[in-house]
């Protein structure tokens, strides 16, 4: 069960995340992107929405969103009995990307959830959620990474030289994804690196 959760393949662990149509995938639903989602979270555990959209091949100015149809399908899935575990878990990544109709569809199940069902809403800005959704959740704030944490991570995992890791940690403002992006530019001259960062 733990191995299935780690690989994001547990049958009682559902995922909703912003999607968009691409040349390869014509249905903008989370299920269609699930293999790519698992790959993305393994490769970029601190990835942001733009990283995700790039990973799935979204081109141009398309923005990801979570459709009302997707919300209705997840309600159907959650109404089923759990397959293996005692609880069913729904992870909604970037719930700020719910449009009005999808938020309203999910609101119904948040108001009256099936027994032994947990909802995890992982967002960057809780103020962008509908107040009716926010009022039905228990907020847990995750602090930004400290400069020391980022410096240590960059030195150990990305093999960035210590003084350079400290500079990047300071510039990244507690955002490990931003720090990793900045560290990839370390081969460039300092002036070029700073210009790109700006």
Annotate each PLM feature:
Residues 1-4, 14, 115-118, 124-198:
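Charged, glycine-rich active-site and insertion segments that engage polyanionic ligands
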Residues 1-101:
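Clamp-loader machinery-focused feature within the broader ASCE/P-loop NTPase space
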Residues 76, 108, 135:
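Conserved adenine-binding aromatic site and its adjacent loop/helix in ATP-hydrolyzing domains
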Residues 79, 104-118:
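Conserved catalytic/switch belt of AAA+ P-loop NTPases
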Residues 89-93, 106, 117-123:
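Structural recognition of the conserved hydrophobic beta-strand(s) that form the central parallel beta-sheet
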Residues 97, 112, 128:
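Residues immediately C-terminal
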Residues 101-105, 132:
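Generic recognition of short, well-ordered alpha-helical segments
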């Amino acid at each position: 069960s733990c191995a299935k959760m780690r690989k994001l393949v547990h049958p009682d662990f559902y995922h909703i995340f912003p999607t968009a149509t691409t040349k390869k995938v014509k249905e903008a639903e989370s299920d269609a992107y699930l293999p790519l989602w698992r790959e993305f979270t393994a490769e970029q555990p601190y990835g942001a929405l733009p990283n995700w959209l790039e990973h799935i091949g979204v081109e141009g100015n398309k923005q990801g969103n979570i459709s009302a149809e997707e919300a209705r399908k997840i309600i159907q899935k959650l109404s089923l009995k759990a397959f293996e575990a005692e609880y069913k878990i729904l992870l909604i990544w970037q719930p700020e990307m719910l449009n009005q109709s999808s938020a309203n569809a999910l609101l119904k199940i948040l108001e009256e959830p099936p027994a032994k069902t947990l909802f995890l809403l992982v967002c960057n800005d809780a103020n962008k959620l509908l107040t009716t959704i926010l009022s039905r959740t228990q907020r847990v704030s995750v602090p930004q990474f400290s400069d020391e944490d980022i410096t240590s991570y960059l030195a150990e995992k990305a093999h960035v030289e210590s003084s350079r890791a400290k500079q990047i940690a300071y510039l990244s403002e507690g955002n490990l994804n931003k720090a990793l992006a900045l560290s990839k530019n370390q081969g460039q001259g300092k002036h070029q690196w700073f210009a790109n960062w700006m």
